Design a protein with these regions (language model features):
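ABC ATP-binding cassette signature C-motif
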Residues: 1-70, 157-354
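Coupling and communication elements adjacent to P-loop NTPase active sites across diverse families
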Residues: 60-175
Length: 354
């Protein structure tokens, strides 16, 4: 939890030896890292500084790749246009009408005819040289561009109630221990609510009571819940992943593809069977499914666990773009800062709203 992470950061900050660590926690990386080793495509690349410095360097690299690719496309287009023009000129110089062919070439015109042949050959030679330059252009990979996620307006989000969930005097005990004690809170429409607190404070229990429709919790009639639990990613299905998701949504294939692309799935991955996915890939599909199903309130219990940084950032975009209400637990401070519009703390079984 937050308190123990800060203690760990303090301990490691004053440690005099070398620390080599693996983490997807951006707060932790920013506090401790002096160098970052990025492992990608079988290679390791070193960046100096903490995570924020790493991000700035990555953005610069991305912009450089974009500029190089843009210049490559510009040069290639210019050469192709020049090649087409020279080809047309060569063809025009070689064109002789039927009437001209039937005419007997006089000695006085012979020199002019030879000159035309010379011009034609020169133009063809120039065109060939331009084509060779095109072939010699180095292959430049297209810079990856992020696609902004936009969820269209949908009637499923019209709940006609500014507080679709009201909790009144919710009490819950387990094994003679009171976990939630007369909790009272209203969940506003379309808010992104972070549920924070120490380990064991009752955050997951709180979400479970909402999911179970505890008698002390009142729902607007049109509420439809979607839930994600820790380790909730075991999908048993032999359908291709694109087909699997399209069967579970009213959104267009374009939107589903854009979500999959943002989660790192390329065109060649879309026919992969659900049952063949790795654990990390299955988590991505489970989360994507939540945001495209006809839900209007989503409960997420520690969704960033087991996710790499790129997927965490994609999830941040999904939550921010989502038009419904999201209630989530997370110990990832950066994640909370990025997406939460409201933060609720659980302490000693009580709600502290901040």
């Amino acid at each position: 939890d937050k308190e123990h992470r800060q203690l760990l950061v303090a301990d490691l900050t004053y440690y005099y030896g070398t620390v080599l660590f693996v983490s997807h926690d951006r707060f932790f990386l920013n506090q401790l890292a002096e160098k970052i080793w990025e492992v990608s495509d079988g290679h390791v690349k070193e960046y100096l500084g903490n995570y924020d410095a790493y991000c700035r360097q990555k953005e610069l690299e991305q912009q450089t790749r974009y500029n190089v690719y843009h210049q490559y496309q510009k040069e290639k287009k210019k050469l192709q246009e020049s090649y087409t023009k020279k080809q047309a000129q060569a063809q025009k110089s070689s064109h002789v009408s039927k009437k001209q062919k039937q005419k007997q070439i006089k000695p006085s015109r012979l020199a002019g005819s030879k000159q035309k042949d010379t011009v034609q050959k020169a133009l063809q030679k120039q065109a060939k040289a331009i084509n060779a330059r095109i072939d010699r252009l180095p292959d430049v990979a297209q810079a990856k561009q992020e696609r902004k996620i936009i969820f269209p307006t949908n009637n499923q989000f019209s709940l006609y109630n500014p507080y679709p969930i009201r909790i009144e005097n919710l009490t819950f005990a387990y094994e003679n221990r009171t976990i939630l004690n007369q909790v009272n809170v209203q969940i506003p429409l379309n808010e992104k609510i972070a549920l924070c607190g120490k380990n064991g404070a009752g955050k997951s229990t709180f979400l479970q009571q909402i999911e179970a429709c505890h008698p002390a919790i009142y729902f607007s009639p049109k509420v439809r819940l979607g839930t994600y639990h820790q380790l909730d990613y075991r999908l048993k299905n032999d359908e291709p992943l694109l087909t699997y998701l399209l069967k579970r949504t009213n959104y267009s294939e374009k939107i589903v593809r854009s979500l999959l692309y943002r989660l790192g799935f390329q065109q060649e991955n879309l026919q992969t069977k659900i049952s063949s996915l790795s654990g990390g890939e299955a988590i991505k599909i489970t989360l994507a499914q939540l945001f495209i199903e006809p839900n209007n309130i989503i409960l997420l219990d520690e969704p960033t666990n087991f996710l790499d940084l790129e997927t965490i950032q994609a999830l941040e975009e999904f939550i921010s773009a989502y038009q419904g209400t999201v209630i989530f637990t997370s110990h990832d401070e950066t994640f909370v800062e990025k997406v939460a519009t409201r933060t609720i703390y659980l302490e000693n079984g009580k709600i502290i709203d901040k």
